Amino acid sequence: MLFFIDETWQTIAGQRVGALGAVAIPQDQYNGFCASMYAIKKKELGASELMHAEIKGQSCFAKSAFKRQALHGDSALLKAADRLLGALTSHQARVFVIWTTHPDLLTLRHAGTTKVAKPYKELLFDFRALMENEAPGHLGSLNFDLRGTRADETTAAAIQNYMVRTRGGWEQHFLCVPNFTVSSVSPGLQAADVIAYLGARLAPGQDRPELQPYIERMRGLTYEFTRPGRSARRIRTARRVS
């Protein structure tokens, strides 16, 4: 199972929101997903190579894209986003969103390598639930955007340390060393960017009603599982932490 993770920070109704967005795609589906993404980029955005015309949530869902759709009847960026969500469905993907408005969690990470911040920890728990329930005996691979920042390196080291130092059977379900890839050459990371953008819009006060159909489609791709314990609570992998 391939997991692709991205981050976003947005101001919604005057409130700062931080969100992690992730996509899980079965490894045997990923080449097909990449082929679908190339077809989308070629038809809708005029790309001649897979790495051209990077798809990003902020661009696809910009107000200007909706204005163009209203004035001219279509928008290439909105079509690309629509078809991307369709490709996630057809290639058996699941999506994950952890969002927060809590001042202490807004950075989404810790400054050091010895502790994983709560948003990332909750995301990892959800990943593990998917692996335990849907892919037992297989290993998941965590993939991040290679931006070359020290903060990214620190987060990767913190996740690796957490997996190897704590109980939880992480090594049974994951390769404990995260991968970093430039997002322009990774359809999975571009999908995670779109999911992160929409995921932040789950925050109260969402002031862009035109986004609601896309948000609902994103919700439909989330994973739902029962958390072990007395309460046996049902958990859906698009939620707030505080």
Role assignments for model-derived ranges:
Residues 1-242:
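Phosphate-ester processing/binding pockets and catalytic centers
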